[in-house]
Amino acid sequence: MRIEKLRQAYDITTSWVHFPLHPETPAEGREMAGFYAERGLDPEAMYQRMKRLMDAEGLPYGRRTHTYNSRLAQELGKWADTQPNGEALHDALYRAYFVDARNIGDPAVLLDVVATVGLPVEDARAALDERRFKDAVDADWEKSRAYGVTGVPTFVAARQGVVGAQPYDVLVQLLDAAGAQRRG
């Protein structure tokens, strides 16, 4: 993945900043066909586009029929950032949503994903039930608005950013312009 390659080439720290891509999506989700139709987009063309992008990154990508509200998954991601090996949850949530087409707005699904990566399920349940990371996600959403984020992924370095799946060379230019130090 490009980010891993950048971490090896540069002395940088990366962090997840969550963005409200479609916060109006209900907990039970929405059918992709209707979602795309409202925007005048062809579902098959969109699937093929995303598949190509994910293939270029070496990431698996399944055929989803629904889109789901990611708010609770984002809160759980913030919780995972406080846990040893928490990064594994981000990868597992990607797989659950984009490969296995699971409803990441459903707390039971989220806790199942937590269990698959060996994080403490009861701690995760408490974090979700008590909405412990709601404010952190709210702050991320505000930060993303302040940066002018309009899509995902967005890469930001020294207050400059690029939106969308970008070639590695574009990300290198972003880091060089930000004065990031190369390794070795």
Q: Over which residues does each language-model region extend?
A:
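C-terminal cap of thioredoxin/glutaredoxin-like
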Residues: 1-12, 16, 78, 82-184
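Structural alpha/beta surface segment adjacent to cysteine/selenocysteine redox centers
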Residues: 1-100
